[in-house]
UniProtKB/Swiss-Prot annotation:
It holds the Pfam family SCD. This is Cohesin subunit SA-2. The modification Phosphothreonine is found at residue 1112. Phosphorylated by PLK1. The large dissociation of cohesin from chromosome arms during prophase is partly due to its phosphorylation. Residues 1-75, 1062-1087 are annotated as: Disordered. Its main location: nucleus. Keywords: Acetylation, Cell cycle, Cell division, Centromere, Chromosome, Chromosome partition, Meiosis, Mitosis, Nucleus, Phosphoprotein. The modification Phosphoserine is found at residues 1058, 1061, 1064-1065, 1177-1178.
Length: 1231
């Protein structure tokens, strides 16, 4: 046996360090914690009797107490001897020298050295206790652990493995390295002394079964790393045994005369020693596996489970002959159902290491067939990291054996190339590429040097097109290209091949592309060019543009050069071939925006530029489709860059085209508007087609010099006068006139303008607004929607916001809509947005199209509502107009709830008091509508009245939890509500309640938002409206008054005012820490009084009168109404947005009694919608699988040396349910 080299070491005995690391005693009920693990012979504590200990190491002298000494190592570089824990914590010293020092200490006195090692593990767990020599001699492990448990600091939940900070950053890696180096340095002698390893394994096994999380976590990590180090030792022993056996066989096969008997005896002796050592290692590993792994791989703590799975993966990969079998793979398979993503992730990474080695595939066949479906389902895991690794694992499975995965399995992965999460999509793209594109037929080898249609990529490009069409997601070609960009760059950048497939005739016997396939190929080609030129993923993938490296920038420039050189020549040909196909032309016309325009000059390609401009002109003349015309306009815009010499050539072509269109339009318009003649359909079509072309170009180009406003105004005015103008002409005329105004404003803003320019623009804008206002009452809905949208844009652009940023010279352009225009805009919203959806469909065949049209219509209505709400938020229209919007909150919550809720939030940021008055106004409007419909003798239990109360409750929830912040607004809200309730006296006399008294029942929903002293003040104000007879009434008709009075008196006698009173315990917990600093505010609040009017008057001036002392705050001076978006960043304080500070879940708990009283409704509370992850979750599976699981674990049986392999029996099938589960688990679905 080879002994470790001895290093002379002198040990200094140090006093106990004062440094302790606190942790908490995190007791947890772990399944099986009280079970006595069956231990092998080496799992005993293995301590010798006191007499034997006295003889060991120090010559029979009594060892010093462990509490008065801590082991250290030699002084190095002037650093004094330190504890093992301190050295590992620092992570700076060479770990091997630290271990060598400890080995020398162990040789000198193994009890003291082991005591230091035991205290090392205790300290690494964050326990401040110390195991003394007395405890080590006379106490069992369980007693020591119980004693250490008592030493934990229960006020802290941290321990070294979980502590944050730079000093703990490398602790885990240093800790693991120490254990690995310790075993490696002891592998030739000390680990076989039946003392050191027995003691360490016994201690770690006991600690791993502790109820204290820190002990369990740290000891499990140590035991697993110890096991990994032992596996490495066992592997080395196996290799040495095989080598020894070969040497023995070679020597024995020699002729008798040449055979060395002494060498044979030495080899036999060596093999015997190695076999004994291997048996010892087997016993140690069995003890760790049975005592730690089989219990901790299903621990309640995810980190502990993850450690076990990670290490077993290492064992199977490192020593596959011993561990890569069904007996151990089953643990990984079971744990793939773990409820925590990090544990499932460890399972997948462990399996990846196995499937990556193709030599191990034969040992994984049974596991693959058993757990393949689970792996496939994990591609939809709710944790994206897990889904990515599952796809990568399936890619390795695919490479190992294509027959394993069925077509259905592959299809489950294919569709993930369209995932919005880029890592998932990229992994799926690699799987797709390996499956469909990586194989090459032998006959294609000769085509490697060919390009274009005859090149090797031609068939692959066709395959990509076929896949894209079969996936039926034709609007997402950019996502498909991005998914495959990293793994199939060469294929996707073979633009010569794509161009050849489009332009060249098919070879003999080759099937030509269909029209649908050509459209798909053009779309894919466009997406690959965009990806190469822009070097960032499409919208929705990635957080934004990243800074490119120098290599990426060079690749980008090279690609743009290739693109320009190829398509500058090919694009005119492609446009000529597909000039009548709107879809193909629209995509092809986007290519020039990715060109390097300088190459037109440097490459002498001007004639190809002229050909391109001719083709664009022809397309403009042929097409009237808006998408095609806008694509032509954008192409001219991309080519008209003044930085390049081609600008003049392109500008002349563009001007000639616009000249012809403008002249034609004026000529056609003159004939079209002639008095006394009815225009025929052909004239109308000519006017419309020309107007479409001009409008499309005016979107991207400044056409001010053609003075298009006058002719469009004339056209629109005639439409108003006659009322028979075709709707499409009106729509495009409105749009074109809108562009004229915007281009003039841009010109005035960017350059110095004259007063005449401002006045002309002001006049045109005012006249245009009047035109749009007239068209709001048009009979055609599409025209009205266009007029409304443009009018909202104009009002937003020319509002007071136009002067922001120091542009005071634009003040003459500010336009504020009058009350009639505001009324018409609001009426349009009420008539065209808040309408019932038509749910009946005419036929089953058209049901899908009908559903799509409904979604499209809803999207359009949402845009209309958002445009009007923007006017409210930016104070372009009066805030009280929002009352008609807010009152629809409940009825149309599913369609517009998010828009209305955001509008409430923004208006409250601008003016809390005015927002509160708007909310109460909306409730008053609903109340009046109910009175008009049902009369004053309505049933207060009716659904209509209950709906108004529910809406009031929702409004109350939106005020959040900070009552100080909303104090003024709530006070004003109650004031307006009280005045409304007593506004209409009963004609029958004072003995009968006021007509609107029932409104107090609705107003009581806001009482919980009043501060305690404000409730008293509001109560006093309420009494101003009450007569003596009213206070004595107890009939049912007076119940609203009694209910409201009681709501104001509730909590009035409390000595302690709580800003968040009424919250449940859960809500209080959420804000407990944040509520502490408010004590100072409370003292101020206690001294406040609400200023009351002297008489029972409803005037705001009396309500708002203030005394010189501190009063309950009421309506302050209205702040300057500025847009929340246009404000400077410093004005956008976090508290200005209550939506982000006060989650609605806490508000839900604020009034639990109201919830119970009302029962279930459409929305139980006013909280942000919880979007459930569409991906599957495997939560809850591990408990079901663990319950009743039979842990009849096997002994670790290392494979014999080659001379014994023929006697090895086959292992049983450990995936047989009978061998791993009892009857209670057989019915559990694994997938």
């Amino acid at each position: 046996m080879i002994a470790a080299p001895e290093i002379p070491t002198d040990f200094n005995l140090l006093q106990e360090s004062e440094t302790h690391f606190s942790s908490d005693t995190d007791f947890e009920d772990i399944e099986g914690k009280n079970q006595k693990q069956g231990k092998g012979k080496t799992c005993k504590k293995g301590k010798k009797g006191p007499a034997e200990k006295g003889k060991s190491g120090n010559g029979g002298g009594k060892p010093p107490s462990g509490s008065n000494r801590m082991n250290g190592h030699h002084q190095q570089n002037g650093v004094e001897n330190m504890m093992l824990f301190e050295v590992v914590k620092m992570g700076k010293s060479a770990m091997q020298s630290v271990v060598d020092d400890w080995i020398e200490s162990y040789k000198h006195d193994r009890d003291i050295a082991l005591l230091d090692l035991i205290n090392f593990f205790i300290q690494c767990s964050g326990c401040k206790g110390v195991v003394t020599a007395e405890m080590f001699r006379h106490m069992q492990n369980s007693e020591i652990i119980r004693k250490m448990t008592e030493e934990f600091d229960e006020d802290s939940g941290d321990y070294p493995l979980t502590m944050a900070g730079p000093q703990w950053k490398k602790f885990k890696s240093s800790f693991c390295e120490f254990i690995g180096v310790l075993v490696r340095q002891c592998q030739y002698s000390i680990i076989y002394d039946e003392y050191m390893m027995d003691t360490v394994i016994s201690l770690l096994t006991g600690l791993s079964d502790s109820q204290v999380r820190a002990f369990r976590h740290t000891s499990t990590l140590a035991a697993m790393k110890l096991m990994t180090a032992l596996v490495n030792v066992a592997l080395n022993l196996s290799i040495n045994m095989d080598n020894t056996q070969r040497q023995y066989e070679a020597e024995r096969n020699k002729m008798i005369g040449k055979r060395a008997n002494e060498r044979l005896e030495l080899l036999l002796q060596k093999r015997k020693e190695l076999q004994e050592n291997q048996d010892e290692i087997e016993n140690m590993m069995n003890a760790i596996f049975k005592g730690v792994f089989v219990h901790r791989y299903r621990d309640a703590i995810a980190e502990i489970r993850a450690i076990c799975i990670e290490e077993i993966g290492i064992w199977m990969k490192m020593y596959s002959d011993a561990f890569l079998n069904d007996s151990y793979l089953k643990y990984v398979g079971w744990t793939m159902h773990d409820k925590q993503g990090e544990v499932r992730l460890k399972c997948l990474t462990a399996l990846q290491g196995l499937y990556y080695n193709k030599e191990l595939n034969s040992k994984l066949e049974l596991f693959t067939s058993r757990f393949k479906d689970r792996i496939v389902s994990m591609t939809l895991d709710k944790e994206y990291d897990v889904a990515v690794q599952a796809i990568k694992l399936l890619t390795l499975v695919l490479q190992s054996s294509e027959e394993v995965l069925t077509a259905e399995d592959c299809e489950n992965v294919y569709h993930l190339v369209y995932s919005a999460h880029r890592p998932v999509a990229v992994a799926a793209g690699e799987f797709l590429y390996k499956k469909l594109f990586s194989r090459r037929d032998p006959e294609e080898d000769g085509l490697m040097k060919r390009r274009g249609r005859q090149g090797p990529n031609a068939n692959l490009v066709k395959t990509l097109v076929f896949f894209f069409l079969e996936s039926e997601l034709h609007e997402h070609a950019a996502y498909l290209v991005d998914s495959m960009w990293d793994c199939a760059t060469e294929l996707l950048k073979d633009w010569e091949c794509m161009n050849s497939l489009l332009l060249e005739e098919p070879l003999s016997g080759e099937e030509a592309l269909t029209d649908r396939q050509e459209s798909a190929l053009i779309e894919i080609m466009l997406c690959t060019i965009r990806q190469a030129a822009e070097c960032h993923p499409p919208v929705g993938r990635g957080t934004g543009k990243r800074v490119l490296t120098a290599k990426e920038k060079k690749t980008q420039l090279d690609d743009r050069t290739r693109i320009t050189e190829l398509f500058a020549v090919a694009l005119p040909q492609l446009l000529a071939k597909y000039s009548v196909d709107a879809e193909k032309v629209t995509n092809l016309l986007q290519l020039p925006q990715y060109f390097d325009l300088e190459i037109y000059t440097t490459g002498r390609l001007e004639k190809h530029l002229d050909a391109l401009l001719r083709q664009i002109r022809n397309i403009v003349e042929k097409h009237t489709d808006t998408d095609v015309l806008e694509a032509c306009s954008k192409t001219y815009h991309a080519l008209c860059n003044e930085e390049f010499t081609i600008f003049n050539r392109v500008d002349i072509s563009r001007s000639q085209l616009i000249d012809e269109l403008a002249d034609k339009f004026n000529r056609l318009l003159e004939d079209f508007l002639q008095e006394g003649e009815e225009p025929d359909e052909d004239d109308a079509y000519q006017v419309l087609s020309t107007l479409k072309r001009i409008t499309a170009f005016h979107n991207a180009h400044d056409l001010s010099k053609w003075d298009l406003f006058a002719c469009n105004y004339k056209l629109l005015k005639t439409g108003i006068e006659n009322g028979d103008m075709p709707e499409q002409i009106v729509i495009h005329a409105l749009q074109c006139a809108h562009y004229v105004i915007l281009w003039q404003l841009a010109k005035i803003t960017e350059s110095t303008s004259t007063k005449e320019d401002l006045l002309r623009l002001k006049k045109q804008m005012r006249v245009f607004c009047q035109i749009c206002q007239h068209y709001l009452t048009n009979v055609n809905t599409t025209v009205k929607e266009q007029a409304f949208t443009i009018l909202c844009d104009i009002l937003m652009i020319f509002s007071h916001q136009i002067m922001s940023g120091g542009r005071d010279m634009l003040e003459p352009l500010v336009y504020t809509p009058d009350s009639s225009l505001q009324s018409e805009l609001l009426s349009f919203i009420l008539d065209h947005v808040f309408i019932e959806q038509d749910d009946d469909s005419n036929s089953a065949d058209g049901q899908q199209e009908d559903e799509a049209s409904k979604i499209e219509a809803l999207h359009k209505r949402r845009n209309l509502l958002a445009a009007f709400c923007k006017l409210i938020v930016y104070t372009v229209v009066e805030m009280n107009t929002a009352a008609d919007i807010f009152k629809q909150y409940m009825k149309y919550y599913n369609d517009y709830g998010d828009i209305i809720k955001e509008t409430m939030s923004k208006t409250r940021q601008i003016d809390k008091i005015q927002c509160a008055k708007t909310l109460i106004l909306s409730l008053q409007q609903l109340f009046n509508e109910m009175i008009q419909e049902n009369g004053y003798n309505f049933d207060r239990s009716s659904s209509t009245f209950s709906g108004i109360k529910e809406l009031a409750r929702r409004f109350a929830l939106t005020f959040g939890l900070d009552q100080l912040k909303t104090r003024e607004a709530i006070a004003m809200l109650h004031k307006d509500g009280i005045e409304f309730a007593f506004k209409e006296p009963n004609p029958q006399g004072e003995s009968h309640p006021p007509l609107n008294l029932a409104f107090l029942d609705i107003l009581s929903e806001f009482s919980s938002k009043l501060l305690r002293q404000d409730k008293r003040t509001v109560y006093v104000y309420l009494e101003k409206f009450m007569t003596f007879q009213m206070s004595l009434r107890r009939e049912d008709v007076w119940l609203p008054l009694m209910s409201y009075r009681n709501s104001l008196l509730a909590g009035g006698d409390d000595d302690t005012m709580s800003v968040i009173s009424g919250m449940s315990s859960r809500g209080s917990t959420v804000r407990s820490k944040k509520s502490k600093p408010s004590t100072g505010k409370r003292k101020v609040v206690e001294g406040m009084q609400l200023a009351l009017p002297e008489e029972s008057s409803s005037s705001d001036s009396m309500w708002l009168s203030r005394e010189q002392t501190l009063h309950t705050p009421v309506m302050m001076q209205t702040p300057q109404l500025t847009s929340t978006i246009m404000r400077e960043p410093k004005r956008l304080r976090p508290e200005d947005s209550f939506m982000s500070v006060y989650p609605m879940q806490a508000e839900h708990h604020q009034t639990p009694l109201d919830y119970n009283r009302r029962g279930t409704s459409l929305m139980e509370d006013d909280e942000e919608p919880i979007v459930e992850d569409v991906m599957m979750s495997s939560e809850g599976r591990i408990e079901d699988l663990n319950e009743g699981m039979d842990f009849d674990t096997m002994d670790i049986d290392l494979p014999p040396s080659k001379n014994r392999r023929e006697r090895t029996e086959l292992k049983p099938d450990f995936f047989d349910p009978a061998s791993i589960m009892d009857e209670s688990v057989l019915g559990v679905s694994m997938f």
